[in-house]
Amino acid sequence: MELRFTTSFEREYKKIVKGNEVLQRKVRKQLALLAKNANHPSLRLHKLGSSKYWSISIDPSIRVLIILERQWIYVYHIGKHEDVY
């Protein structure tokens, strides 16, 4: 599936990974895995209640919110667990 990034995600991404190359690599790795296999166990993909959003884990504290569609994955937000939920 192909990833589509929102403006808000791009803005949040730049802010959260600024100066942190390790986190940058983790985010890129998990997003590449998401595009290849959204059901991979390391993503810890789960639906957020009855909303249209799904969540994946980047590491124990960082989450990315997405919307799954037929041929696209819309990447909406990135942030700390408590901020994104």
Regions found by a protein language model. Give the residues of each.
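A short, surface-exposed loop/turn module that caps and links secondary-structure elements
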Residues: 32-56
